Structure formats: C-alpha cells, structure tokens
C-alpha cells in the first residue's frame, strides 16, 4: 500500500489547540525531516507486516555479534518474539520502523540489539571512535531506568566498547556534563532532559545515527510537545528512526511525519495479543463496599500471588494502605510524590517477590492529560491509520465528565513536574503479576487495556478484577466517594464493547454478600480510623522516609549492597487510632469452607497459656534454700510488734 505525504496547509491555525496540531504545523515548516541523505524528497512507503503466527526465526539467524548472542544466552533469551524477529532484520538494513506491539512483547530488545550491533561494527572499524550515535527517548523516568538496565545486560560482554548514560538520574548538572563530555554511545532520556542539555551545549547530536521514541503514543500526551518540537529541529538528516508503541494514534502519526523517512509499519498481532490469557471480571458494588471486598479478598487469601491495585489519586493510595494496615495486610505505595530512586526500587523489589501488593496511583489517566490529544484527533481523523487503533476512536467520548474540567487538569499538568515524568500503567515491566485490581475504574477503555496489560504477560495467565459503582449508589458514602465513579457504568459499557471486538469477555463476578457482610463492622471500624488528617500525616511521613532512603543512603547502599535488602517500602504508616484486634479474624466470622484453609490446626506449639507457677517466684523459693535469699548469719530476727516502744509523752 503506497501513500504519498502531502502537507496539509488548509487548516485554520487558530483552531490548533492540541500538541498534535502544533506539531503538524512544524511538519509543514520543517520539511527537512522528509528529505533523504541527498536532500531529495522521499516518497513515504508504508509496508504493513501483519503477523499472526510466530516465525521459526532464532537469534543465530539474525547474524548478531557473538558478544550480543552470549548476553542473550545469559539472560535466557532462547527465541525472538514476533516483533523482534520482524524488526531486527529491517533495522539492520537501515530502514525506519514504526512498530505496534503490546507492552511486554519485547519491543525494547527489538531496537536495542540492532543499535548495539551497529555500534560494535563501527568500533571494530575504528576503535578510537567517540561519538554519541544513539538517542532513546521515553516518557517516564521509570521506563528510562528500565531501558538502561536492558542496555547494560545486553552489552555485558562488550567491555568498554559500548557506553550508555541515563540522563533522568537525579545527579547534579556538573556530574551530568562530565558524563556527557566523554561522548557516550547511547543516551536514554526524557525529551525534556535532552533539550535541557542541548541548551547548555553539554550534549551534541551532530553524529547521531539512531533515534528511538519508545511508547511513542505517550510522549506527546505527557506534555513533551514543545520539547519534541525543539528536538525535531536539532536532529540531523538521515537518522534511522524507531517509533515503538502499543497503539497507533494520531500522536504516533504526527511523530512519524516529523522523524521518519519511508517507515516500515509493523502491526504485530499474535494470538496472545491484547488481553488473551487474562480472565476479566467486574464487580458492581457501593463505594464503601470497595474497601470491604478488598479486605475480604486479601485477608481470606482469595487471590494468590502478586497484585497491582490501581487507584485514582495519591490520597486514595494512602487511604487504602492505612485501611489495609489495620488488618495486618502489608502493601507498597507507588506515586509521583516519591523520589525516583524509591519508585524504581519498589518495582525491582516487587519483581523479586519481596512485596506482594502494590497500590499505584494512575495519576496521568485521572488528571486528564490525554484529553487534549483526543480533541486533536478529531481534527486529524482523515488519515486511515488513525482510525485503525485498537478502538482508540471509541475513547473520544469515553470521558464526558471531564469535558467541563479540562482547563483545570491542563493547568495542573503544566505546573506538576513530578507527575509529568511518572507513569505506572504503561511501559514498566512488572513480572509475574497474578492480578490487576481496578479499585477505581479508569475513565477510558484505552486506559483499562493498558492497566490489565500488567498481568498475563509472556504467555502466562492473569486476572483483572474491576470495581464498578452503579449510578444509584454513587455519592451514598461521602468519605469513600471518588468523582470519576459517577460515570463508571458508561465507561464499563465501552470497555465491554471494546473487549468484545478483541474477542474477550468481561464477566460479572458475584460475592456471597451474606458471608461478606459479617466483616462489615470491622471494615467500618477501620475506615473511621483513616481520617483526612491521618492521610496527610502518612503522606508527609512516607515522603520524609523515602527521601532519607533515596538520597542520604544511596551511596552507602552502593558500597554495601547486602544491606539494601533491609530497605523496605511496605512498613506501617500508622493510622490515627490503633486497633490491634482487627488484625485477627475470629473463627465465627470465617466461612465454613475457608475455615480449614486459614486455621491454626497445623501450626506448631505456641506457649500462650501458663503451664505452671510463676517462673521467677519459683526460682526465688528454690534459691532461699541455697542461701542466696537469706540474710547473713549472726543477725537476730526482730519482731517489730514485740519491740515497738511508743514512748512516753
């Protein structure tokens, strides 16, 4: 299928409000993006690669450097994924690539391996070569750290031939300038950090040969449109570009027009794509019953394995954490307020199995950061590609409740630097997640798809459980009410419709409420203790603790890695009122079927009851016979009643 790029100049520029429109204007002005190395306008050829069955390709047939193959063996990469088997050969041929594949399909290795291969070939021809030839752009710091770790693993046997720098690390500008002065081969960064270093001349892109924009559909949505605008002017012509995304949206199409030359478009659709292998359930419940059901699920161990709980904002994170703490249920909090080192460490420890429950605030989705991009899509909906997006067109009216509030989230987005580079529902590689619990239902079906994509990865089974508040139950319990729950039913209808198009079913799940109601009074006691003041104090206390762990102890832990194991993030934050009795479940509350599973019959002897007289008193009586408790000999015992002399007045 052939399409010739035709710049659109007939738009009314006054109507351009979203990042996609502003960048489309740049695409018209900055036509050098569409010229090849000989300054000749290139015709944009889109070759669609639809792959439903995995090839028999192996890493040996990809002709990679032996050092890279050795690293793959060490990391137990036995067979390339569909996106790797298609993208790597094309990348080694020097073609621009736009790949759509779900998160967890191996997109990172699909662009890291060919870039490393090219660097090693250049170093073999000229060992003294020092130049920054690769730039990898990601929307969040967490994803930057993840990509950097992949580069380190794959270049483990390359010695000093490959050097990479992560610009999102929290170091001083002087340290960052020193790292860049040595001309690292690869740079991983957010767009904002690249522009900042270009402005100070600490970074030079003159020798750049590879540009990667990972999670391309999120880069503009996270507020980097101005940075991308400036970056498009700074990148030289002829750079090989990789656009990797889980969805093909209008933002991706805009980036393609800015940076790509005749890209090959890969639409990978394997049999496990988009939620296959994930059992999806929905529970209709009142607002306070969300807490009740969460308590029952974890206290009765109804879900085995690691769980990610998605909530609407940071306050909900701490409200739920403090609530679960009172029942002895430990959990971690993950949000944009925490230092980046703490967030990365939480994810790493969760993947190692140190923690079982993470409560994550999906702030980017709730703050409405994608509303402007959705509006811009309506203006550029003429492109056929923008319509073929995993149901992205359905999301345009997914959020009616936010249309009147769009100005406030936009303002908050611009002033919130922490939230700008934080994202948890996309890109982060959570491993072996058994269940995703949507405590607060997302406001779009697109966000729902990304959330449940945290489980059921690499062909494993997973479960997604979502709480939905019916319209007639919204606002009935003010302390636990959340604004977005008002439209849960309309959002659920769109989610069900979209999942049905993908061939998946969202099934209703019914709890036996007669048995669950027995725990309601305990839930009520726990919720009373979680006051607004307790939440504010918990947030402040957590930030203080994590800042100490993140900054002052970072160097110490680098020198003493064994002590890092004691750095935990699931400690108690302490509610306003401690109620120890809530941590234990009386036998009369236990369901008859579940009583045996969590009973103490098979527990060894624990000496709670006295088995005899007081031990100290018994020892004292015994010692008296040995003389230890007797007074020295020669001292006569005196009876005070017989020797008492009142005396005369």
From Swiss-Prot:
Residues 617-634 have a biased composition (Basic residues). SMART domains: DEXDc, HELICc. Residues 375-392 have a biased composition (Basic and acidic residues). GO terms for cellular component: nucleolus. Disulfide bonds: none annotated. A motif (DEAD box) lies at residues 214-217. It catalyses: ATP + H2O = ADP + phosphate + H(+). A motif (Q motif) lies at residues 57-85. It comes from the Eukaryota. Its EC number is 3.6.4.13. Residues 88-266 form the Helicase ATP-binding domain. The keyword Ligase does not apply. Residues 39-60, 370-420, 612-649 are annotated as: Disordered. ATP-binding RNA helicase involved in the biogenesis of 60S ribosomal subunits and is required for the normal formation of 25S and 5.8S rRNAs. Belongs to the DEAD box helicase family. DDX56/DBP9 subfamily. The Q motif is unique to and characteristic of the DEAD box family of RNA helicases and controls ATP binding and hydrolysis. This is ATP-dependent RNA helicase dbp9. It comes from Aspergillus fumigatus (strain ATCC MYA-4609 / CBS 101355 / FGSC A1100 / Af293). The gene is dbp9.
């Amino acid at each position: 299928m052939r399409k010739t790029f035709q710049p659109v100049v007939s738009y009314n520029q006054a109507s351009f409000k979203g990042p996609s429109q502003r960048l489309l204007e740049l695409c018209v002005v900055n036509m050098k993006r569409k010229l090849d190395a000989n300054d000749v306008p290139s015709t944009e050829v889109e070759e669609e690669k639809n792959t439903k069955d995995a090839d028999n390709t192996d890493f040996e047939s990809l002709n990679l450097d032996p050092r890279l193959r050795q690293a793959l063996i060490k990391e137990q990469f036995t067979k390339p994924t569909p996106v790797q088997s298609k993208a790597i050969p094309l990348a080694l041929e020097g073609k621009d690539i736009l790949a759509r594949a779900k998160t967890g399909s191996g997109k990172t290795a699909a662009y890291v391996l060919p870039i490393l291969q090219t660097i090693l070939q250049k170093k073999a021809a000229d060992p003294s070569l020092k130049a920054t030839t690769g730039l990898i752009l990601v929307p969040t710091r967490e994803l930057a750290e993840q990509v950097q770790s992949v580069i380190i693993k794959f270049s483990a046997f390359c010695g000093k031939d490959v050097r990479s720098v992560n610009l999102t690390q929290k170091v001083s500008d002087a340290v960052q300038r020193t790292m860049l002065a040595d001309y690292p081969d690869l740079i991983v960064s957010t767009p904002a950090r690249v522009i900042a270093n270009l402005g100070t001349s600490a970074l030079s892109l003159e020798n750049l040969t590879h540009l990667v924009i990972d999670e391309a559909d999120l880069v503009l949505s996270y507020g980097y449109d101005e940075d991308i605008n400036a970056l498009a002017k700074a990148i030289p012509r002829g750079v090989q570009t990789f656009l990797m995304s889980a969805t093909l949206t209008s933002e991706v199409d805009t980036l393609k027009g800015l940076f790509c030359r005749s890209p090959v478009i890969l639409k990978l659709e394997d049999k496990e794509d988009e939620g296959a292998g994930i059992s999806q359930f929905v529970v209709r419940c009142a607002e306070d019953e969300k807490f009740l059901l969460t308590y029952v699920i974890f206290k009765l161990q109804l879900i085995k394995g690691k769980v990610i709980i998605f909530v609407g904002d940071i306050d909900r994170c701490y409200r739920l954490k403090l609530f679960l703490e009172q029942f002895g249920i430990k959990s971690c909090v993950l949000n944009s307020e925490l230092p980046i080192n703490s967030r990365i460490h939480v994810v790493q420890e969760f993947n190692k199995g140190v923690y079982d429950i993470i409560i994550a605030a999906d702030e980017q989705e709730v703050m409405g950061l994608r509303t402007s991009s959705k509006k811009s899509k309506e203006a550029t909906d003429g492109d056929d590609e923008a319509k073929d997006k995993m149901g992205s067109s359905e999301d345009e009216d997914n959020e009616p409740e936010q249309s009147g509030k769009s100005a406030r989230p936009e303002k908050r987005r611009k002033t919130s630097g922490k939230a700008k580079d934080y994202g948890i529902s996309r890109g982060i590689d959570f491993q072996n997640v058994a269940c995703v619990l949507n405590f607060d239902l997302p406001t779009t079906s697109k966000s729902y798809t990304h959330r449940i994509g945290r489980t059921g990865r690499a062909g494993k089974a997973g479960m997604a459980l979502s709480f939905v508040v019916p319209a007639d139950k919204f606002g009935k319990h003010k302390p636990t009410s959340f604004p977005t729950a008002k439209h849960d039913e309309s959002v659920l209808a769109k989610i069900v419709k979209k999942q049905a198009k993908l061939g998946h079913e969202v099934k209703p799940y019914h709890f036996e409420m007669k048995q669950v109601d027995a725990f309601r009074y305990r839930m009520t006691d726990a919720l009373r203790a979680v006051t607004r003041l307790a939440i504010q104090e918990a947030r402040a206390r957590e930030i203080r603790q994590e800042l100490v762990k993140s900054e002052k102890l970072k160097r110490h832990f680098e020198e003493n890695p064994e002590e890092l194991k004691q750095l935990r993030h699931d400690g108690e934050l302490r509610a306003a009122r401690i109620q120890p009795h809530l941590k234990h479940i009386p036998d009369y509350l236990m369901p008859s079927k579940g009583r045996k599973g969590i009973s103490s019959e098979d527990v060894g002897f624990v000496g709670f009851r006295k088995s005899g007289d007081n031990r100290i008193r018994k020892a004292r009586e015994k010692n008296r016979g040995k003389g230890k408790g007797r007074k020295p000999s020669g001292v006569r015992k005196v009876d005070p009643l017989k020797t008492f002399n009142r005396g005369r007045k």
